[in-house]
Amino acid sequence: MASFDYLFHPFVPCTICPDFPLYKSPAFPSSCLHHPRLLFNDKAFCPLFLVPFPASFTRWLTFLFHLVIYNNKMHHHTYAPHIHDLRAALDTTAPQKKCPKETLHRSDHQG
């Protein structure tokens, strides 16, 4: 089975929230895996559902866990400085930063 190491390669700047680190997927070169709700006209959509299952189930679960945590934090317009710093992601007492482009997330906060 093919390796999916590209999911764990170094970060590139996000074009939506420049201060937010993310991974780029070769299958979705213009998509940000940390902004699944912003893909395809702001409809809730996770690109992982269209990617073949990776060789390492544990690494896939770890990546999915990170995605869920950070998607939840983006829903509240906050983010941790590094995707692998789970302590910062889970520490609700730590200072949080606002998303610099929070208006782009307004579709999740209507009503």
Swiss-Prot record:
The chain crosses the membrane at residues 48-70. It is a single-pass membrane protein. GO terms for cellular component: membrane. Keywords: Membrane, Transmembrane, Transmembrane helix. It is found in: Membrane. Its main location: membrane. Partially overlaps ERV2, YPR038W and TIP41. This is Putative uncharacterized protein YPR039W. It comes from Saccharomyces cerevisiae (strain ATCC 204508 / S288c). The lineage of its organism: Eukaryota, Fungi, Dikarya, Ascomycota, Saccharomycotina.
